[in-house]
């Protein structure tokens, strides 16, 4: 489709911009491998995305200083309870600069799911760049095979999130079988 646009842009005014945008976002297409990460958890363990191969993974990028992120915490707990015992893991990736404040919130609120933090935090961190994060909260749904199913799933507070997650189980190979992507970086 992008190549077809060249016919409508004979002076090549817009094509380079569209090509750059396409190149930036193709890594997040449905079926593309999600970038792996290695992050410290609130309990001191090291967590990698590939640790959850074979499971549906709901990624929640957040900050403890963001009001919208904090409001969604209650919904996150409720959503995780609804999927308890199912083949899904909720990974909450904090982009907090202040490790102590993050750990305290995780401990005091007894936040469920996998709680990890990006050392140094912020939207300029390597993880934020690899996932092209522009803001928090940001949610992503990764299939059992480690590929993106949805880079803009329903928010934790949305009633439709439950249906969307239920419909995502077992969908990973549907998208990746038709597309030849390079191997996921580990």
Locate the predicted segments by residue.
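Oxidative protein folding and maturation machinery
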Residues: 1-45
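Alpha/beta-hydrolase fold active-site loops
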Residues: 56-57, 137
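Thiol/disulfide oxidoreductase modules built on the thioredoxin-like
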Residues: 111, 120-166
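Structural microenvironment flanking redox-active thiols in thiol-disulfide oxidoreductases
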Residues: 71-109, 122-129
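Conserved redox-active cysteine motifs that mediate thiol-disulfide chemistry
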Residues: 53-54, 60-81
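Sec-dependent signal peptide cleavage junction
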Residues: 163-186
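Active-site acidic short loop of glycosyltransferases
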Residues: 53-55, 85, 111, 133
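Generic structural signal for well-ordered beta-strand positions
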Residues: 47-48, 149
